[in-house]
């Protein structure tokens, strides 16, 4: 069953609204129709089984059938500190790490990093990585979306580890 993380504001008491990329995915890719069931979560405190009632190009509306208890994430949180690899390999690290349960990703620039790091593109890159983490969490049926931080220096990584 498909799982979607939606903002808390889109959760009503008896229904949910799915908008944006997730609505596009449901309508165009999954070809969802009224009557299909999905799981929706805000990634924080609510998870529900819902049945699609209305399908539009930009918005999918679903009635909440039952609220589900959120299963606990592991008590031990795994953080992945990864020096920036070549090409799009960081995306693979985030995707696979999310699927196996990582809670946070800390990309960093080290002395031996080959990639030419461009600080101007950091915001866009971090947003892309966060989107990949969200999609991997949906696919792996995780309850929470891992945090993908901006690029750090090795010294900053060591300071965070000391806390």
Where are these regions (language model features)?
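N-terminal positively charged helical leader segments and presequences
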Residues: 1-69, 120
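RNA substrate-binding interface of SAM-dependent RNA methyltransferases
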Residues: 71-163
